[in-house]
Each structure stands twice: as C-alpha cells, then as structure tokens.
Design a protein with these regions (language model features):
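N-terminal Rossmann-like FAD-binding beta1-loop-alpha1 element of flavoenzymes
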Residues: 2-27, 32-34
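Glycine-rich loop(s) and the adjacent beta-strand/alpha-helix scaffold that form part
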Residues: 20, 24, 31-34, 39-41, ...
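Rossmann-like flavin
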Residues: 62-64, 68-136
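Helix-loop-beta segment of a Rossmann-like dinucleotide-binding subdomain
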Residues: 94-99, 123-163, 300-306
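Helical element adjacent to the flavin cofactor pocket in flavoenzyme catalytic cores
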Residues: 136-200
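A glycine-rich dinucleotide-binding beta-alpha-beta segment and adjacent secondary-structure elements
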Residues: 137, 141-144, 316-379, 383-387
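FAD cofactor-binding and catalytic pocket of flavoenzymes
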Residues: 218-319, 323, 361-362, 371-375
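An active-site-proximal "capping" alpha-helix that borders the catalytic cofactor pocket
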Residues: 384-399
Length: 399
C-alpha cells in the first residue's frame, strides 16, 4: 500500500495513476471533502507579516487556482536528470490544456492582448484547464468554481476513489514511523483519536509548508528556505468594462523578470477612490520569481525577506503593466496598485538538497511530491510542473 498525505495537484494525480494500476492507495487529507463552489471558505490563514494564498481541503490550492497550466523550470530540472517532456504531453492531453476559445475571451482581456501586441510584448492566450462548455464566465475561479468548470485535484481524487483508493479527510499527521532509516507508516489524528497506518511507501503531498513541517517531525530540517511568487495587481478605470466578471488571467505576457496577466483585484477600487466600482476596473497581475529568502518558523508561520531584486522585478513589471493599461484605454490618472502578496510557496524540501531525482528523501520509501521539491521559484503557475513530476513519480513507483 502507498500512503499519500495531501490531495493537491501532486497527491491527486499520483493517487489516481496508482489506483488505476491496481496499487492499493490511502489518501490522508488534513482538510475536508468539499464542493468546489465552497472552496473560498478554506483559504489558509498566516501571520500578519505575509499575505500568502493557499487552501486546505480536498484538491488543495487547485480548488482556488485559475487553472493556469504553463511549463516551468525545464532547464533547472534537467540539471538534476529530470526530463518531463513526455509527462507534460501526457498531462496536457489528460486535462485538455488549451488557450480559451474566443467565446470566453472577454472585452477587458482582449484589450490587454491587443495593447500588449501593439507594444511589441508578444502576448498569448494563457494555457488553461477550463472547459468552455461548462464555464459561465463569472470571474469566480479564485473563490472556487460554482459550476465545476475547471480542472482541480478533486477530479483525480474522485477517480482514485472509484478505482479503489481510500480517502480519509479531516485527518492531521502527527508523526512518521521509521525504523532503520526506512519509512514504516504514519500516525494521524481523526475525530480526536490517534490512529496508525503502516506502509513501506509514504508520499508527502501536503504542500510546501505542510510537507516541510511533517519532515521536521523526524529530524529532517526542511523549510529553512522557502520561495513564493510575489505579485501585485495594477489597475485603473474604464467605465463599465465589466472585466470583473470575465474569466481571469486568460492572457499572458512573459517578460525577462516577470509575467503579466489580466486579473481583477477587489482591492483596486478602494485604492483608486472616487466613484470607481468593480465593473469599471481593468487590472493586470504582475508576478515574479523570488530569491528563496523566506523560511518557516517552528509552528509553520511564513517569514518572507524581500531582496533588492524581488522589489526591482516587481517594479519593472508594474511599469510595463501601466503602459499596457494606458494603451488599452485606462485613464492613467486612475492607475493604482494593490499591496504585495504571494502565491505558489515552494522550495522547502528541494531536489538536490532533501530529495533525489526520484523525489525520495534520505529515509527509504519516504517521498515528497509537491512544490516543496522545486529547486527555485518558477515565477509562473507551477501546477502543470507538479502534475508532470507526479506522473513521473507514479511511473517510478509502479515500476
């Protein structure tokens, strides 16, 4: 039997692939099994020093993601002997990654694409796993899709269960059981009672913070380095644009040190003031990689140290976003920015430091399979890369 801790992108596809190959699987999920429309209620809360977007529930942060699917860190992973080209092809076909049909490209997104093209920025449609036949174009992706029109880890968990996997939710790992440098099982709390589950193969897919905290329970000092992708949203007024109800982040500009994507932020109207309403805002997310100078405290709080480059790259991206907005017809006098936030934490148990190229730790049979293992910050949505790494691990475990 394989025990998988967590059901986000990594754990979900791993469970599905193993179960479909008749490998006994038990998934232990700290959060609840929920409907996608309720995912907004399961965002995690961190200390006041950092605004980091993650969720704890079935499917993990995929439930509140924009379903953006871009390849990332190809060269960096290849340096560790990891070539994901076949796995990328497999996953992209499996979840039907594509740029949205024009029917689902709203007016604000089209203005972004056209303005960026005029400025020579080579915009493209964002590769996504959203299914137009179900999508109602409500702009609520980050709150949990009300009609289940995007891919989430929950979809793969359900398939795993259909193929015989056991799913235990609202269960928190309290310890790992090891013997002679080998994994032997896990201890967890369910309904206030500690239980033990034995296995010679345990895979931690609890996210960069959760997996690192579990590793610390057996003396593996993970989480002393941590990245997340810093971002701000820059926006201004175009009266009655109604961008806030469009499919978000449906376009993409890839710069040298940042990425830009049209994204409505509810914080923008208050930053602008006056009579600006949500329906009047066109805004752009500016996202960059960071230099992995964050870390986790003993109780899992996140501390982020901003470097000069972190701030410089965000400023560069924000300036370019301003040019795009003005070209798109935004009144430049109304342009404002949100505060700094973060998404996609990772690097807490990186390949080459805590796991090998097969994602196995120094403890035989104990693997890590989530953004923890990414060697550097991608500065892009990492879900597709995690899915590809997980498919590779599934093939390895199946043998």
């Amino acid at each position: 039997m394989v025990i998988i801790v967590g059901s986000g992108a990594g754990g979900a596809i791993l469970a599905m692939e193993l179960a479909k190959s008749n490998v006994p699987v038990t998934i232990i999920e700290k959060g609840k099994y929920i409907d996608s429309k309720d995912a907004f209620n399961y965002y995690d809360k961190y200390n006041g020093s950092v605004d980091l977007l993650t969720a704890t529930c079935v499917g993990g942060s995929t439930m509140v993601s924009m379903a953006n699917m871009v390849r990332a860190l190809d060269e960096e992973l290849y340096d560790y002997g990891i070539n994901l080209s076949e796995e990328y092809d497999y996953v992209e076909n499996l979840i039907k990654v594509h740029g949205l049909d024009d029917t689902h490209i709203g007016k604000g997104t089209q203005l972004f694409l056209d303005a960026a093209e005029e400025l020579g920025l080579n915009p493209i449609k964002m590769p996504k796993a959203i299914y137009e036949e179900k999508c109602i174009q409500c702009g609520q992706c980050a709150f949990g899709c009300p009609v289940d029109a995007k891919w989430t880890g929950k979809h793969f968990v359900d398939i795993a269960i259909e193929n015989g996997a056991e799913f235990i939710d609202e269960a928190e790992i309290t310890d790992l059981i090891t013997e002679d440098n080998r994994i032997k099982g896990v201890k967890f709390i369910k309904n206030g009672k500690e239980e033990i589950l034995h296995s010679d193969t345990v895979v931690l897919s609890a996210g960069a913070i959760g997996s690192a905290l579990i590793l610390r329970k057996i003396g593996i000092d993970a989480g002393r380095e941590l990245f997340f992708d810093p971002f701000v949203s820059v926006g201004g007024v175009i009266k009655d644009i109604n961008f806030n109800t469009e499919v978000q982040m449906a376009g993409l500009v890839v710069g040298k040190n940042f990425v830009l994507s049209p994204h409505y932020s509810s914080f923008i109207p208050s930053k602008i003031g006056g009579d600006a309403e949500p329906k009047d805002i066109l805004s752009i997310m500016v996202k960059t990689s960071d230099e992995c100078k964050g870390y986790m405290t003993g109780d899992g709080d996140v501390v982020k140290i901003n470097t000069i480059n972190d701030i410089r790259y965000l400023a560069e991206g924000a300036a370019v976003a301003g040019f795009i907005l003005e070209k798109a017809g935004v009144n430049p006098a109304t342009i404002a920015s949100t505060v700094y936030r973060g998404a996609h934490p990772g690097g807490s148990a990186a390949i080459g430091k805590f796991v090998d190229s097969n994602l196995e730790t120094e403890i035989k049979g104990l693997f890590v399979d989530d953004a923890s293992v990414l060697p550097i910050s991608p500065g892009k949505p990492p879900i597709l890369t995690i899915l590809a790494l997980s498919k590779r691990l599934a093939d390895y475990l199946i043998g």
